[in-house]
Amino acid sequence: MKTLAKVGVLVASMCLVLPAVLNAAEKKEPAGEKLFQQHCAACHPGGGNIIKPAMTLHKKDLDAHGVKTAKDIVGKMRNPGPGMTRFDAKTVSDKDAQEIAEYILKTFK
């Protein structure tokens, strides 16, 4: 009887722990990357720019245009120049815009 109880406890423990282990093992796409793919990648594949090739999302080009911080990138999203879609807060929330901006700065160096 004690062996059966131990097996029951072991099975119950595995049922509780296994889902957490499987979730941790799953590769999760960072929020910024997912949002970038959803809203930006069509015109900025790989950090490039299919409309204005000289205005990429790479650090040297961002710096050349006075875009140095995540706040600057969000500002460009909200009030872009000619040729870029405007992403207002109804289209991309402030939180999501910040995630995208941080992803850009981290990814396209």
PLM region spans:
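The canonical Cys-X-X-Cys-His
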Residues: 32, 36-46, 100, 104
